[in-house]
Design a protein with these regions (language model features):
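C-terminal structured domain segments
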Residues: 339-403
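Long, acidic/polar, low-complexity amphipathic helices and coiled-coil-like
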Residues: 79-220
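An anionic, turn-rich surface loop/hairpin at beta-sheet edges
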Residues: 110-133, 229-242, 334-357
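Preference for solvent-exposed, low-hydrophobicity sequence contexts
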Residues: 158, 164-282, 293-297, 305, ...
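C-terminal motif of bacterial Sec signal peptides marking the signal peptidase cleavage site
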Residues: 15-19
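Acidic/polar, low-complexity intrinsically disordered N-terminal segments immediately downstream
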Residues: 21-108, 143, 166-190, 414-423
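Sec-dependent signal peptide recognition
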Residues: 2-10
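N-terminal glycine/threonine-rich, aromatic-flanked beta-hairpin/loop signature
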Residues: 61-106, 194-231, 285-332
């Protein structure tokens, strides 16, 4: 009997506990839903309350390892108008698309229709399946009247929308940023120092600052451009024993530490001898060894010699003494196999599937990394193309492509050329 009584008491207690838990759960769910709905409404209200819009310092790459960008956005009636300093956008360009604020993971701000100024940082390309790892959906984590704190839904970078003052002109502001971008060089050093710890490297296309620690380790930090200079994201740059978060950029491109303007850095250009030697040329599908040497009696001309498929080829490279960079142009070269009268080493835009035939790629020296990176030289920009690839086509002696079964014959294929690294 005693055992039966204990069992009944336990059963009643369990039922009572379940009932209480059930009541609490219903109460919590209801209040949480109300709170989220209220936050959603408040987020949209605050977004559309700014007459001159919001500024967003936007970061790509997981853990903010990519570049930093500035976007200006005006929200109204479910639409958002965007301008920005990304390479794809002119300071005067504006693109309008739609946006939503929903409660899928708490309040989520979503740019739910395509905006070419904003979305391209997250778009996949042939070379990068995840693009630049950019978000266009953001979990709202905190709201004030002048700031909206968000976290990227996919890449989880923390960012802040800040209210733009009513008297700030968007075009003038973005033009000031663009002017700073144009003044940025690549290789900087304190004085004439050859000490790597007194040098930095600016990679404007990736928005990265590279520096070296005393032990030789390379440190890579993202930055965004301001109207007066550049701001290092995450950690300050350590340079000659000084920590620098912000660099000012002078009209002549000289860098100075914002908090210590006596610390200045000037650009330097590598000499032609920097390029002489043995290198590894890397592209998407692999790499090959290439030897670079001077061309006799030809000032600022170099020759690249490499072997592939059992044959040794020679290509021409132009040296620019002002920048210290090389240029790989589209050119006719000899076919060492004697199968064809000539080969046309032709530049191409692989992203658009276009053979171009004029222009080429610069090989930009990066002093901290001690490598040369391939970049489009801008020749075909007015056609809407970007050179990222070189292909050698079989040709007649007059430069006319030879075909087989109505297709061009590709002898050399360098897809998405990446860099030159020194062989040790």
């Amino acid at each position: 009997m005693k055992h039966i009584f204990i069992a009944i008491v336990c059963l009643l207690g369990s039922m009572s506990l379940q009932s209480c838990l059930h009541d609490d759960k219903e109460f919590f769910d209801e209040s949480a839903a109300n709170r989220i709905e209220s936050t959603v409404e408040n987020t949209q209200k605050i977004l559309e309350s700014s007459e001159n819009g919001w500024q967003l310092h936007y970061f790509t790459g997981k853990g903010m390892t990519g570049g930093g960008y500035t976007f200006l956005m005006k929200f109204a009636n479910g639409k958002v108008t965007v301008a920005g300093d990304a390479a794809i956008a002119d300071p005067t360009e504006r693109v309008t698309s739609s946006y939503t604020v929903d409660r899928s993971m708490g309040p989520v701000l979503s740019f739910n229709t395509y905006n070419n100024i904003f979305h391209f940082l997250g778009e996949p390309t042939y070379g990068e399946i995840e693009g630049d790892q950019g978000d266009w959906e953001f979990v709202v984590t905190k709201l004030t009247e002048d700031s909206i704190f968000v976290r990227g839904k996919k890449w989880e970078n923390e960012m802040v929308f800040t209210r733009i003052p009513a008297d700030l002109d968007w075009t003038s502001y973005l033009n000031s940023i663009a002017d700073v971008q144009k003044r940025l060089g690549v290789n900087y050093r304190v004085g004439n120092s050859t000490d790597a710890s007194k040098m930095i490297e600016i990679n404007s296309s990736k928005r990265h600052i590279l520096s070296r620690k005393a032990n030789g380790q390379i440190v890579e930090q993202p930055f965004y451009v301001t109207t007066t200079g550049i701001h290092a994201v995450n950690e300050p740059v350590v340079l000659d024993g000084n920590e620098v978060q912000d660099f000012l950029v002078s009209p002549t491109g000289v860098l100075s530490a914002k908090d210590n303007e006596a610390l200045t850095l000037k650009t330097y250009a590598p000499s032609i001898d920097t390029w002489i030697g043995n290198w590894t040329l890397s592209a998407m599908q692999g790499s090959c060894d290439i030897t670079i040497s001077k061309v006799e009696d030809e000032e600022n001309m170099l020759k690249g010699t490499f072997t592939t498929g059992g044959y040794t080829y020679n290509i021409g490279l132009d040296f620019d003494p002002e920048t210290g960079n090389l240029n790989l142009p589209s050119q006719m070269i000899e076919d060492p196999s004697d199968r064809y009268p000539a080969l046309w080493l032709m530049n191409a835009d692989l992203n658009k599937g276009a053979l171009l035939g004029n222009g080429g790629m610069n090989i930009v020296w990066h002093g901290v990394a001690q490598e040369g990176d391939f970049e489009d030289d801008g020749t075909v920009a007015d056609r809407g193309n970007v050179t990222d690839t070189f292909i050698a086509l079989a040709c007649t002696s007059k430069g006319e492509p030879i075909t087989k079964d109505d297709k061009y014959i590709f002898v050399i294929e360098w897809y998405f050329l990446s860099n030159l690294t020194q062989n040790k």
